[in-house]
């Protein structure tokens, strides 16, 4: 395609930086990486890898395995079970390890599509789930290598956002300020 200023890419919750600048598509809502499909049935990254999706996975796993360390840590939580994942991982809980592996694999598979299209230098994991920290980063980085084509090996560096779950509001404030609002 020639003679256009923007080009639509099938990348749908996050953001892209291209040439050191925030990428803006033809319409607001570009780079919705969380809406990348994981299968033909329409399952998107957000449905399997967001904080609320991990909360659901944890509730289901704890109902099946009530003696796990993860179950013990979430027994009295009304919501936000994903916050218990990091401490349960630190205890070596196999239920927590299994959930992390599933989430990291799904996230890496979805991000492999972004990698094949954009070939970024780095993928930054932010939001509440990034509070799991290094175990999440390492698991996604390892899983991503299975899905990235050989020409892009070893694939992009995977990093954790310094802002954690504050990335979205801070980014929104930055964009509002940049727009002069």
For each feature predicted by the language model, list its residue ranges.
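Glycine-centered small-residue hotspots that permit tight backbone geometry or close packing
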Residues: 3, 13-15, 104, 108
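Structured loop/turn residues at beta-strand edges in well-structured enzyme cores
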Residues: 2-3, 31, 118
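Glycine-rich phosphate-binding loop of actin/hexokinase-like ATP-binding domains
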Residues: 8-52
